[in-house]
Structure formats: C-alpha cells, structure tokens
Amino acid sequence: MAAARVLLLLSGRPESVSFAQSVCGLLGAGSGLGPWPTHCGLKRGQLVLSDKPFPGASARLPLQRPPFCPFAALDQQPRAPGVELPPKGRGVDLGVAVILQSSDQTVLLTRRTSTLNISPNLWVPPGGHVEPDEELLDGGLRELWEESGLQLPQGQFSWVPLGLWESAYPPKLSWGLPKYHHIVLYLLVISQESQQQLQARIQPNAGEVSAFMWLGPDIAAAVAATEDGTETPKHLPQDLPSSVPTVELKENGGAQPLALPTSTLLRTTPGTADSRERVSTGTKFALTLWLQHLGRKSRDGS
C-alpha cells in the first residue's frame, strides 16, 4: 500500500509536495533555526499543513528541521547536471512517532538495528509510516505495538500532538543526496502505568529494535541540549550519571542489562556517513517538546 502523503494548503486548496521541495521553505521558513508555528489538519491517512488558519485545522504545532536539512540546502543552490533525485511524481511521506510517557514521567526510546537500511543504530521513539486509511493516533499505536509489543488498554492513556519534524535520509548533503523525505508527527502518549509495569510487558521486535531504555527528564534535557549543527555545545550539568540503564537484545532472542555510556547519547550528527549509535536530531527536538509539556503541566499544577 502506498505511503500516506503530506499536503500543503498554499493557494486555497490542498496540494501534494514534490519530493525535492523543502516543506519548511514552502510554509515560509526563513533562514532562522525555527521552529515555525504551523496549522495542521490531522486527517485519516494524511496531514494538511498551512502557515495560516484554515477550516478543518485541528492543531497548531511547531514545525522544525535540522540546521543542515538537505532540502533547505538544495533550495539554495542550483542542481548540478546529472544530479538526480527521486522522480517528480514522488511526494513527501508521512510518519508518526510515539513518545510514550510512563506514569512516573520517563519516556521510551529504542535503538534501531544495525542491519536497517535507514538510520541504523539511531535511538528513536517507536514509529513509522502511517497507512492511507489510518487515523494518525492509530498508526502511532500500531507502530508502538509492532516495535515494542506494548498494547495500551483503552481508557488507560491520554495523548496530545507535540510537533512536526522535516526528516531526510541521508540527513546531510555531505552524506549523499536524500533518498527519503518525511514529515514526522510526534505524539505524546501518556500511560497510566508505571515504567516498571510497562517494562514487564515489553517484547521488542528484534528485526527492528536492538535495545531500549527509559529516559527521565534530567537525562532527556542533557540529550536535547546537544543540538546538532551548532558550533558551540551548550553547558551540560556536571552531575550527569556516567551511564544510562539500557536493555539490549541478544542474538539468541534473550535480553541483558547494559550500562550505556551517557556520552553515547550526547553525540551529534557527523559530517560524513557514520553508523555509530546516537540519538537522532528529530528525537532531540521531540524530547525538548516533551520537557516543555512537563513544564506546563507542572506550572498548571496537574
């Protein structure tokens, strides 16, 4: 089944986006770092975006891209002769990722296996493509179940859309021309179960996941602060633990605890193709949005 598409409301009607076009650029993003507030219609199997309010818009979300977004770079430079991107008929795909929060305020990240063609060894939240006939939340919950084995009982979770990320792979032009172009919708799904209760039910899909971990706000803040593409790293707390508890899958199908060096999670995207494990840039953005959500809830007293 064909992947769902991202549509933009540019001249009064929804239009598909060509693969090579920068979605942020089409929506009026300048040369700044963003994010840019974007009006969204969250429809079955598709996402309609506009920089202005429109009938049917159900949310206003921050849209962001990395400072080194290859589509933004391609917008600024002439295409060299013989340089080919995917066919003009191919659009921008829609992905969804679930930031699963336990009742004790930790979130689940999974490490993609080293054998995957796209983004191997990256730490990301569970997620993937939305099918054309799926509600976006249903697509996120399906991906959560397929990757982690977790099914959340109806009535025992709440959810809210967090933000949008323009994603490319390879992530930098210095790695090669992009072959994949997505808008990823990050959904915060808040479970009524604790981390311990959720962990007892996790059954990771070894074809996609090689390890998983739960991050609390302190480590998440440090990870989110290591912004890819910045010249000077932000000041990091001196009291960060040297390692983070992780569960790694073994080749025989079992699992074992692993103390992952915290420094691994603080790596940024290198200038040349590299499959060393790190947290994806989009995930850092999503963690920032999650921490902002926690802060608002704390101020509201809820």
Curated annotation (Swiss-Prot):
Acts as a decapping enzyme capable of hydrolyzing monomethylated capped RNAs (in vitro). Hydrolyzes monomethylated capped RNA after alpha and beta phosphates to form N(7)-methyl-GDP. Shows low activity towards unmethylated capped RNA. It catalyses: a 5'-end (N(7)-methyl 5'-triphosphoguanosine)-ribonucleoside in mRNA + H2O = N(7)-methyl-GDP + a 5'-end phospho-ribonucleoside in mRNA + 2 H(+). GO terms for molecular function: metal ion binding; NADH pyrophosphatase activity. This is m7GpppN-mRNA hydrolase NUDT17. The gene is NUDT17. Its cofactor is Mg(2+); Mn(2+). It holds the Pfam family NUDIX. CDD domains: NUDIX_Nudt17.
